[in-house]
Protein backbone atom coordinates (compact mmCIF):
# COMPACT_ATOMS: atom_id res chain seq x y z
CA UNK A 1 0.00 0.00 0.00
CA UNK A 2 1.12 3.52 -0.70
CA UNK A 3 2.59 5.42 2.22
CA UNK A 4 3.07 9.14 1.98
CA UNK A 5 4.46 11.59 4.51
CA UNK A 6 3.45 15.24 4.34
CA UNK A 7 4.80 17.91 6.68
CA UNK A 8 2.40 20.81 6.74
CA UNK A 9 2.92 24.20 8.30
CA UNK A 10 -0.58 25.20 9.23
CA UNK A 11 -1.48 28.83 9.79
CA UNK A 12 -4.05 28.77 12.54
CA UNK A 13 -6.64 31.45 13.03
CA UNK A 14 -7.48 31.66 16.72
CA UNK A 15 -10.86 33.05 17.68
CA UNK A 16 -11.24 34.27 21.24
CA UNK A 17 -14.72 33.92 22.66
CA UNK A 18 -15.54 36.09 25.67
CA UNK A 19 -18.28 35.29 28.15
CA UNK A 20 -20.59 32.36 28.69
CA UNK A 21 -23.27 33.33 26.16
CA UNK A 22 -22.75 31.56 22.79
CA UNK A 23 -21.48 33.91 20.10
CA UNK A 24 -20.28 33.89 16.54
CA UNK A 25 -16.50 34.09 16.89
CA UNK A 26 -14.30 36.83 15.50
CA UNK A 27 -10.62 36.60 14.68
CA UNK A 28 -8.64 37.69 17.73
CA UNK A 29 -5.13 36.27 17.38
CA UNK A 30 -3.04 34.43 14.80
CA UNK A 31 -0.61 31.70 15.78
CA UNK A 32 1.74 29.61 13.65
CA UNK A 33 1.54 25.91 14.48
CA UNK A 34 3.51 23.19 12.74
CA UNK A 35 1.48 20.03 12.37
CA UNK A 36 3.20 16.90 11.14
CA UNK A 37 0.69 15.06 8.97
CA UNK A 38 1.47 11.55 7.77
CA UNK A 39 -0.95 10.41 5.07
CA UNK A 40 -1.56 6.70 4.46
CA UNK A 41 -3.86 5.10 1.91
CA UNK A 42 -6.41 2.66 3.40
CA UNK A 43 -8.29 1.51 0.28
CA UNK A 44 -9.80 -1.70 1.69
CA UNK A 45 -11.93 0.05 4.33
CA UNK A 46 -12.81 3.01 2.09
CA UNK A 47 -16.56 3.07 1.38
CA UNK A 48 -17.13 3.48 -2.36
CA UNK A 49 -20.49 3.22 -4.14
CA UNK A 50 -22.17 4.48 -7.28
CA UNK A 51 -23.47 7.44 -5.26
CA UNK A 52 -20.24 8.56 -3.62
CA UNK A 53 -17.58 7.71 -1.05
CA UNK A 54 -17.16 7.82 2.70
CA UNK A 55 -14.27 7.51 5.12
CA UNK A 56 -13.98 4.54 7.45
CA UNK A 57 -15.20 4.47 11.03
CA UNK A 58 -12.30 3.95 13.45
CA UNK A 59 -11.84 2.68 17.03
CA UNK A 60 -8.57 2.22 18.89
CA UNK A 61 -7.54 -1.18 20.22
CA UNK A 62 -3.92 -1.07 21.49
CA UNK A 63 -0.31 -1.39 20.26
CA UNK A 64 -1.11 1.03 17.40
CA UNK A 65 -3.87 -1.26 16.14
CA UNK A 66 -7.38 -0.11 15.25
CA UNK A 67 -10.70 -1.39 14.06
CA UNK A 68 -11.88 0.16 10.79
CA UNK A 69 -15.45 -0.09 9.56
CA UNK A 70 -16.70 0.27 5.99
CA UNK A 71 -15.29 -1.19 2.79
CA UNK A 72 -16.90 -1.44 -0.62
CA UNK A 73 -20.06 -2.96 0.86
CA UNK A 74 -20.17 -0.56 3.81
CA UNK A 75 -20.59 -3.21 6.51
CA UNK A 76 -17.15 -4.84 6.88
CA UNK A 77 -14.78 -4.68 9.85
CA UNK A 78 -11.00 -4.57 9.39
CA UNK A 79 -8.04 -4.91 11.74
CA UNK A 80 -5.61 -2.13 10.93
CA UNK A 81 -1.95 -1.91 12.01
CA UNK A 82 -0.62 1.63 11.62
CA UNK A 83 3.01 0.46 11.89
CA UNK A 84 2.74 -1.74 8.79
CA UNK A 85 -0.24 0.06 7.18
CA UNK A 86 -1.94 -3.32 6.83
CA UNK A 87 -5.72 -3.79 6.64
CA UNK A 88 -7.04 -7.28 7.37
CA UNK A 89 -10.70 -8.03 6.74
CA UNK A 90 -12.38 -9.65 9.75
CA UNK A 91 -15.97 -10.09 8.58
CA UNK A 92 -19.38 -8.46 8.06
CA UNK A 93 -21.61 -6.91 10.70
CA UNK A 94 -24.78 -7.21 8.57
CA UNK A 95 -25.88 -8.70 5.27
CA UNK A 96 -25.73 -6.89 1.93
CA UNK A 97 -29.53 -6.96 1.87
CA UNK A 98 -29.65 -4.58 4.83
CA UNK A 99 -28.36 -1.66 2.77
CA UNK A 100 -28.78 0.17 -0.53
CA UNK A 101 -25.90 0.88 -2.93
CA UNK A 102 -25.37 4.20 -1.22
CA UNK A 103 -22.31 5.40 0.71
CA UNK A 104 -24.56 6.56 3.54
CA UNK A 105 -25.47 2.94 4.30
CA UNK A 106 -22.23 2.12 6.09
CA UNK A 107 -20.86 1.59 9.58
CA UNK A 108 -21.22 4.90 11.40
CA UNK A 109 -19.24 4.12 14.56
CA UNK A 110 -17.53 1.40 16.59
CA UNK A 111 -17.28 1.16 20.37
CA UNK A 112 -14.78 -1.23 21.97
CA UNK A 113 -16.25 -2.59 25.22
CA UNK A 114 -13.42 -4.97 26.11
CA UNK A 115 -10.42 -6.74 24.59
CA UNK A 116 -8.47 -9.74 25.83
CA UNK A 117 -5.90 -11.57 23.75
CA UNK A 118 -7.25 -12.20 20.26
CA UNK A 119 -10.86 -11.41 21.17
CA UNK A 120 -12.83 -8.22 21.62
CA UNK A 121 -16.42 -7.33 22.44
CA UNK A 122 -17.69 -4.32 20.50
CA UNK A 123 -20.84 -2.46 19.58
CA UNK A 124 -21.34 -1.12 16.05
CA UNK A 125 -23.92 1.36 14.74
CA UNK A 126 -25.25 1.52 11.19
CA UNK A 127 -28.37 2.54 9.22
CA UNK A 128 -30.35 -0.55 8.17
CA UNK A 129 -32.69 -0.67 5.19
CA UNK A 130 -35.90 -2.71 5.54
CA UNK A 131 -36.65 -4.04 2.05
CA UNK A 132 -40.18 -5.12 2.94
CA UNK A 133 -41.31 -1.82 4.47
CA UNK A 134 -38.88 0.26 2.37
CA UNK A 135 -37.64 2.30 5.32
CA UNK A 136 -34.51 2.92 7.36
CA UNK A 137 -33.65 2.62 11.06
CA UNK A 138 -30.47 3.10 13.07
CA UNK A 139 -29.16 -0.13 14.61
CA UNK A 140 -26.72 -0.71 17.46
CA UNK A 141 -25.47 -4.29 17.30
CA UNK A 142 -23.27 -6.24 19.72
CA UNK A 143 -20.44 -8.41 18.35
CA UNK A 144 -17.57 -10.64 19.42
CA UNK A 145 -14.51 -10.39 17.21
CA UNK A 146 -11.78 -13.01 16.83
CA UNK A 147 -8.48 -11.55 15.60
CA UNK A 148 -6.71 -14.91 15.39
CA UNK A 149 -5.63 -16.85 12.32
CA UNK A 150 -9.28 -17.73 11.67
CA UNK A 151 -10.71 -14.25 12.08
CA UNK A 152 -14.45 -13.95 12.60
CA UNK A 153 -17.18 -11.48 13.51
CA UNK A 154 -20.01 -13.02 15.55
CA UNK A 155 -23.20 -11.11 16.25
CA UNK A 156 -24.35 -11.42 19.85
CA UNK A 157 -27.54 -9.41 19.55
CA UNK A 158 -29.13 -6.02 18.96
CA UNK A 159 -28.99 -3.40 21.70
CA UNK A 160 -31.01 -0.70 19.94
CA UNK A 161 -33.31 -0.27 16.92
CA UNK A 162 -34.65 3.22 16.29
CA UNK A 163 -38.39 3.69 15.95
CA UNK A 164 -40.10 4.69 13.71
CA UNK A 165 -38.57 3.13 10.62
CA UNK A 166 -38.77 6.06 8.18
CA UNK A 167 -38.73 6.48 4.39
CA UNK A 168 -35.26 6.86 2.90
CA UNK A 169 -34.41 10.55 2.90
CA UNK A 170 -31.52 12.21 4.71
CA UNK A 171 -29.82 8.98 5.79
CA UNK A 172 -26.72 11.08 6.46
CA UNK A 173 -28.67 12.40 9.47
CA UNK A 174 -28.59 8.98 11.15
CA UNK A 175 -25.81 10.18 13.51
CA UNK A 176 -25.00 6.90 15.30
CA UNK A 177 -22.02 8.15 17.31
CA UNK A 178 -20.99 5.93 20.22
CA UNK A 179 -19.22 6.86 23.46
CA UNK A 180 -18.30 3.91 25.66
CA UNK A 181 -19.07 4.43 29.36
CA UNK A 182 -17.91 1.02 30.61
CA UNK A 183 -17.97 -2.65 29.53
CA UNK A 184 -21.77 -2.74 29.66
CA UNK A 185 -23.02 0.75 28.77
CA UNK A 186 -22.62 3.29 25.98
CA UNK A 187 -24.06 6.61 24.89
CA UNK A 188 -25.59 6.63 21.39
CA UNK A 189 -26.65 9.59 19.24
CA UNK A 190 -29.59 9.44 16.84
CA UNK A 191 -30.35 12.19 14.32
CA UNK A 192 -33.61 13.03 12.60
CA UNK A 193 -33.01 10.87 9.46
CA UNK A 194 -34.67 13.61 7.41
CA UNK A 195 -38.09 12.52 8.68
CA UNK A 196 -40.82 14.83 7.35
CA UNK A 197 -42.80 14.55 10.61
CA UNK A 198 -39.87 15.40 12.87
CA UNK A 199 -41.79 18.43 14.21
CA UNK A 200 -44.49 16.10 15.55
CA UNK A 201 -43.18 14.94 18.93
CA UNK A 202 -45.36 11.84 19.02
CA UNK A 203 -44.69 10.79 15.42
CA UNK A 204 -40.91 11.24 15.62
CA UNK A 205 -40.51 8.69 18.41
CA UNK A 206 -36.81 8.07 19.09
CA UNK A 207 -35.53 10.42 16.39
CA UNK A 208 -33.42 13.44 17.29
CA UNK A 209 -32.34 12.06 20.66
CA UNK A 210 -29.38 10.83 22.68
CA UNK A 211 -29.57 7.58 24.65
CA UNK A 212 -27.75 5.60 27.29
CA UNK A 213 -27.88 2.01 26.04
CA UNK A 214 -27.03 -1.41 27.46
CA UNK A 215 -27.90 -4.96 26.46
CA UNK A 216 -31.16 -4.81 28.40
CA UNK A 217 -32.03 -1.13 28.80
CA UNK A 218 -32.45 2.04 26.73
CA UNK A 219 -32.72 5.40 28.52
CA UNK A 220 -33.37 8.67 26.67
CA UNK A 221 -31.02 11.37 27.96
CA UNK A 222 -31.84 14.36 25.74
CA UNK A 223 -33.83 15.38 22.66
CA UNK A 224 -34.13 18.14 20.07
CA UNK A 225 -31.08 17.08 18.04
CA UNK A 226 -30.68 17.20 14.25
CA UNK A 227 -27.52 15.21 13.44
CA UNK A 228 -24.96 14.68 16.23
CA UNK A 229 -21.79 13.53 14.46
CA UNK A 230 -19.38 13.84 17.38
CA UNK A 231 -19.42 12.73 21.01
CA UNK A 232 -16.89 12.69 23.85
CA UNK A 233 -17.08 12.06 27.59
CA UNK A 234 -14.81 14.22 29.78
CA UNK A 235 -15.11 12.96 33.34
CA UNK A 236 -18.87 12.95 33.88
CA UNK A 237 -19.53 15.66 31.26
CA UNK A 238 -20.82 14.57 27.85
CA UNK A 239 -20.23 16.83 24.83
CA UNK A 240 -21.60 16.46 21.31
CA UNK A 241 -21.10 18.21 17.98
CA UNK A 242 -24.13 18.68 15.77
CA UNK A 243 -24.95 19.74 12.22
CA UNK A 244 -27.36 22.61 11.76
CA UNK A 245 -29.04 23.59 8.47
CA UNK A 246 -27.00 26.08 6.41
CA UNK A 247 -25.06 27.08 9.50
CA UNK A 248 -25.99 26.69 13.13
CA UNK A 249 -23.55 23.82 13.75
CA UNK A 250 -23.24 23.32 17.49
CA UNK A 251 -21.05 22.17 20.36
CA UNK A 252 -23.34 21.06 23.19
CA UNK A 253 -22.93 20.00 26.81
CA UNK A 254 -25.57 17.33 27.32
CA UNK A 255 -27.82 17.51 30.36
CA UNK A 256 -30.31 14.83 31.34
CA UNK A 257 -33.78 15.85 30.18
CA UNK A 258 -32.42 18.67 28.04
CA UNK A 259 -34.19 19.79 24.86
CA UNK A 260 -31.75 21.28 22.33
CA UNK A 261 -34.43 22.82 20.16
CA UNK A 262 -34.51 21.05 16.80
CA UNK A 263 -36.63 21.43 14.74
CA UNK A 264 -38.21 24.41 16.52
CA UNK A 265 -35.10 26.61 16.64
CA UNK A 266 -31.66 26.83 15.05
CA UNK A 267 -28.93 29.38 14.47
CA UNK A 268 -28.89 28.20 10.84
CA UNK A 269 -31.33 28.70 7.97
CA UNK A 270 -33.66 26.35 6.01
CA UNK A 271 -32.22 25.04 2.75
CA UNK A 272 -35.33 25.91 0.72
CA UNK A 273 -39.09 26.27 0.96
CA UNK A 274 -39.38 22.60 -0.03
CA UNK A 275 -37.09 21.25 2.71
CA UNK A 276 -38.44 18.40 4.86
CA UNK A 277 -38.96 20.71 7.85
CA UNK A 278 -38.96 24.46 8.45
CA UNK A 279 -37.79 25.67 11.88
CA UNK A 280 -40.17 27.91 13.82
CA UNK A 281 -37.38 30.40 14.62
CA UNK A 282 -33.92 30.92 13.13
CA UNK A 283 -30.97 32.77 14.61
CA UNK A 284 -32.22 31.90 18.08
CA UNK A 285 -32.33 29.22 20.78
CA UNK A 286 -34.78 30.90 23.11
CA UNK A 287 -36.67 28.62 25.54
CA UNK A 288 -34.38 25.66 24.66
CA UNK A 289 -30.95 24.56 25.90
CA UNK A 290 -28.35 26.76 24.21
CA UNK A 291 -25.14 25.40 22.67
CA UNK A 292 -21.77 26.26 24.20
CA UNK A 293 -20.64 27.37 20.74
CA UNK A 294 -22.16 27.61 17.28
CA UNK A 295 -20.80 28.17 13.78
CA UNK A 296 -22.25 30.34 11.02
CA UNK A 297 -21.50 29.56 8.23
CA UNK A 298 -21.42 25.80 8.59
CA UNK A 299 -18.23 23.80 9.18
CA UNK A 300 -20.03 20.40 9.09
CA UNK A 301 -18.64 18.93 12.33
CA UNK A 302 -17.78 15.29 12.85
CA UNK A 303 -16.12 13.42 15.71
CA UNK A 304 -14.80 14.91 18.95
CA UNK A 305 -11.67 13.77 20.79
CA UNK A 306 -9.75 15.08 23.80
CA UNK A 307 -6.03 15.68 23.43
CA UNK A 308 -3.89 13.82 25.98
CA UNK A 309 -1.80 15.57 28.61
CA UNK A 310 1.53 15.42 26.80
CA UNK A 311 4.14 18.15 26.36
CA UNK A 312 3.90 18.10 22.56
CA UNK A 313 0.37 19.55 22.64
CA UNK A 314 1.35 22.31 25.06
CA UNK A 315 -1.57 24.51 26.12
CA UNK A 316 -3.94 22.37 24.06
CA UNK A 317 -3.42 19.32 26.31
CA UNK A 318 -6.78 18.07 27.66
CA UNK A 319 -8.72 20.27 25.22
CA UNK A 320 -11.23 19.20 22.54
CA UNK A 321 -10.48 18.66 18.85
CA UNK A 322 -13.35 18.43 16.35
CA UNK A 323 -13.19 17.05 12.82
CA UNK A 324 -15.06 18.71 9.95
CA UNK A 325 -16.31 17.81 6.48
CA UNK A 326 -17.12 21.11 4.76
CA UNK A 327 -14.30 23.04 6.43
CA UNK A 328 -11.72 20.28 5.76
CA UNK A 329 -10.04 21.22 9.02
CA UNK A 330 -9.40 20.23 12.60
CA UNK A 331 -10.95 22.69 15.04
CA UNK A 332 -9.21 23.02 18.40
CA UNK A 333 -11.62 24.09 21.16
CA UNK A 334 -10.49 25.42 24.53
CA UNK A 335 -12.75 24.77 27.50
CA UNK A 336 -12.07 27.39 30.18
CA UNK A 337 -14.44 25.43 32.40
CA UNK A 338 -17.09 22.81 31.69
CA UNK A 339 -19.56 25.37 30.28
CA UNK A 340 -17.32 28.10 28.86
CA UNK A 341 -15.55 28.02 25.50
CA UNK A 342 -12.36 30.07 25.10
CA UNK A 343 -10.14 30.04 22.01
CA UNK A 344 -11.45 28.25 18.93
CA UNK A 345 -8.70 27.48 16.43
CA UNK A 346 -9.12 26.07 12.91
CA UNK A 347 -6.25 24.12 11.31
CA UNK A 348 -6.69 23.34 7.61
CA UNK A 349 -5.83 19.76 6.64
CA UNK A 350 -7.32 19.77 3.13
CA UNK A 351 -9.45 16.65 3.67
CA UNK A 352 -13.03 15.83 4.67
CA UNK A 353 -12.54 14.24 8.08
CA UNK A 354 -14.99 11.45 8.79
CA UNK A 355 -13.77 10.07 12.12
CA UNK A 356 -11.12 10.70 14.79
CA UNK A 357 -9.18 8.76 17.39
CA UNK A 358 -6.17 9.35 19.65
CA UNK A 359 -3.22 6.98 19.25
CA UNK A 360 -1.41 5.23 22.11
CA UNK A 361 1.37 7.81 21.72
CA UNK A 362 -0.96 10.84 21.77
CA UNK A 363 -1.30 11.62 18.06
CA UNK A 364 -4.58 12.51 16.35
CA UNK A 365 -5.71 9.77 13.96
CA UNK A 366 -8.20 10.84 11.28
CA UNK A 367 -9.99 8.95 8.52
CA UNK A 368 -11.01 10.89 5.43
CA UNK A 369 -13.71 10.58 2.79
CA UNK A 370 -10.97 10.24 0.16
CA UNK A 371 -9.85 6.93 1.69
CA UNK A 372 -6.86 8.05 3.74
CA UNK A 373 -5.72 7.76 7.31
CA UNK A 374 -3.92 10.81 8.69
CA UNK A 375 -1.53 10.64 11.65
CA UNK A 376 -1.33 14.17 13.02
CA UNK A 377 1.05 15.48 15.66
CA UNK A 378 2.29 18.85 16.87
CA UNK A 379 5.95 19.61 16.21
CA UNK A 380 6.07 22.59 18.55
CA UNK A 381 4.01 24.24 21.24
CA UNK A 382 1.93 27.32 20.71
CA UNK A 383 3.47 30.43 22.32
Regions found by a protein language model. Give the residues of each.
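N-terminal Sec-pathway targeting helices
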Residues: 1-12
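Blade-edge beta-strand/turn elements of extracellular beta-propeller
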Residues: 30-49, 84-101, 145-168, 202-230, ...
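Hydrophobic core register within WD40 beta-propeller blades
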Residues: 56-58, 110, 178, 228-231, ...
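Residue-level signature of beta-propeller blades and closely related beta-rich strand-turn architectures
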Residues: 72-73, 128-130, 192-194, 244, ...
Amino acid sequence: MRRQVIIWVVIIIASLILGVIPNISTNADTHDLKLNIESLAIPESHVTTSTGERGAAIARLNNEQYLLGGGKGGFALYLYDSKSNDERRLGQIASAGARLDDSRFAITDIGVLSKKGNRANVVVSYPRYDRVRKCVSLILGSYQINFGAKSAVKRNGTWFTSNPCVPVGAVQHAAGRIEVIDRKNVYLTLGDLGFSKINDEQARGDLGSLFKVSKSKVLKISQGHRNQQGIVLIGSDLYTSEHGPRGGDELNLITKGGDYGWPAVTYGEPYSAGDYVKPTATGSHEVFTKPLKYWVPSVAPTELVVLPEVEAWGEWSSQIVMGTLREEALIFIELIDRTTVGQVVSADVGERIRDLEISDSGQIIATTDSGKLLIISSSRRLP
